[in-house]
């Protein structure tokens, strides 16, 4: 079971994202602000609308945690430079989130890179 951080400012959408994560057999972790240094997660679903959300994503990406962005807007340069595992434009079908999350979690980001 993976731990998936949910960083979404809208309560109704956050609840839906948590439901999808649970349905896939993973543990949703709600992000309510604060320090991420001691937060251990395997992936994150983030709405990158505010600078603080991008900082959360930047912190997680620095630890090689895969990040999926969800937004009503097309991806901006700030979001794309973080190399998200996926960028889903709202509204999107839930199966798109399921597939993107499963793909992100299937990659062992902590394994050493293959050489040769």
Model-derived segments and spans:
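C-terminal output helix
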Residues: 92-102
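Helix N-cap/capping motif at the beta->alpha junctions
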Residues: 30-35, 53
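Conserved active-site segment of CheY-like receiver
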Residues: 9, 70-74, 91
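Conserved sequence signature across two-component system core domains
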Residues: 7-8, 31, 44
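The C-terminal output helix
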Residues: 102-116
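Two-component/phosphorelay signaling modules centered on CheY-like receiver
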Residues: 10-30
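Conserved phosphotransfer microenvironments
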Residues: 14, 38-63, 72-73
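Alpha4 helix (beta4-alpha4-beta5 surface) of REC/receiver domains from two-component response regulators
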Residues: 55, 72-88
């Amino acid at each position: 079971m993976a731990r998936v951080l949910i960083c979404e400012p809208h309560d109704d959408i956050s609840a839906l994202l948590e439901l999808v994560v649970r349905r896939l057999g993973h543990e949703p972790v709600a992000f309510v602000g604060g320090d991420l240094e001691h937060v251990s997660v395997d992936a994150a679903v983030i709405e990158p609308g505010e600078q603080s959300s991008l900082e959360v994503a930047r912190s997680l990406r620095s630890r090689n945690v895969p990040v999926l962005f969800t937004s009503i807007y097309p991806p901006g340069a700030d979001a794309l430079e973080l190399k998200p595992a996926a960028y889903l434009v709202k509204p999107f079908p839930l199966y798109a989130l399921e597939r993107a999350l499963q793909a992100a979690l299937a990659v062992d980001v902590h394994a050493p890179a293959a050489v040769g």
